[in-house]
Amino acid sequence: MVFYFTSSSVNSSAYTIYMGKDKYENEDLIKYGWPEDIWFHVDKLSSAHVYLRLHKGEKIEDIPKEVLMDCAHLVKANSIQGCKMNNVNVVYTPWSNLKKTADMDVGQIGFHRQKDVKIVTVEKKVNEILNRLEKTKMERFPDLEAEKECRDHEERNEKKAQIQEMKRREKEEMKKKREMDELRSYSSLMKVENMSSNQDGNDSDEFM
């Protein structure tokens, strides 16, 4: 089971936030995450794994402040220890930065690059945020593998279409260049012929 929430800011469209029911489900979330996903977890404490799905083309720096705080509050609220504390640090990083090795426990992860891990601090619990998110909560039993494959398939098709469009434009540019070269060549030829014609005319002039 995966829990889904909706978050939005004044200046952006809605974002999807999701988290697994337990550490075993987290394994599938880690395995079938998307490149657009940002992973959240309470720093140095046990907590839920919360993911934010960015819009295509966005980066971690583009996360609206309100949406960032929604994710941070949600992960804090789903930490047995963190939910009782103030000034809790929450780490977040792109899904692609998560590292999972065979010797790690269920639900445990590391990072490929520590420099890509960011921190946001939740000073204290804000019920207004949690209540608003709770109203958007949905429970689903998704086929994460199938959804990931569908997403990857669409991306492959988009890239294929982009390559085809690029080739079409290159072909069009080459055609235009060839036509311009032919036109210039024809113009030069006409110029030479005109000059020859004028010279022939001058040679035959007779002055009385």
Curated annotation (Swiss-Prot):
It comes from the Eukaryota. It is a single-pass membrane protein. Keywords: Acetylation, Cell membrane, Coiled coil, DNA-binding, Membrane, Phosphoprotein, Transmembrane, Transmembrane helix. It is found in: Cell membrane; Endomembrane system. Residues 123-208 are cytoplasmic. GO terms for biological process: positive regulation of cell motility. GO terms for cellular component: endomembrane system; plasma membrane. The keyword DNA repair does not apply. Residues 21-25 are annotated as: DNA-binding. The modification N6-acetyllysine is found at K23. Residues 145-184 have a biased composition (Basic and acidic residues). The modification Phosphoserine is found at S204. The chain crosses the membrane at residues 106-122. Residues 145-208 are annotated as: Disordered. Residues 1-105 are extracellular. InterPro entries: Jlp2/Ccd25, NFACT_RNA-bd. It holds the Pfam family NFACT-R_1. One of its GO terms (molecular function) is DNA binding. The keyword Signal does not apply. Residues 117-187 form a coiled coil. Transmembrane receptor that senses neutrophil extracellular traps (NETs) and triggers the ILK-PARVB pathway to enhance cell motility. NETs are mainly composed of DNA fibers and are released by neutrophils to bind pathogens during inflammation. Formation of NETs is also associated with cancer metastasis, NET-DNA acting as a chemotactic factor to attract cancer cells. Specifically binds NETs on its extracellular region, in particular the 8-OHdG-enriched DNA present in NETs, and recruits ILK, initiating the ILK-PARVB cascade to induce cytoskeleton rearrangement and directional migration of cells. Belongs to the CCDC25 family. Interacts (via cytoplasmic region) with ILK. This is Coiled-coil domain-containing protein 25. It comes from Bos taurus.
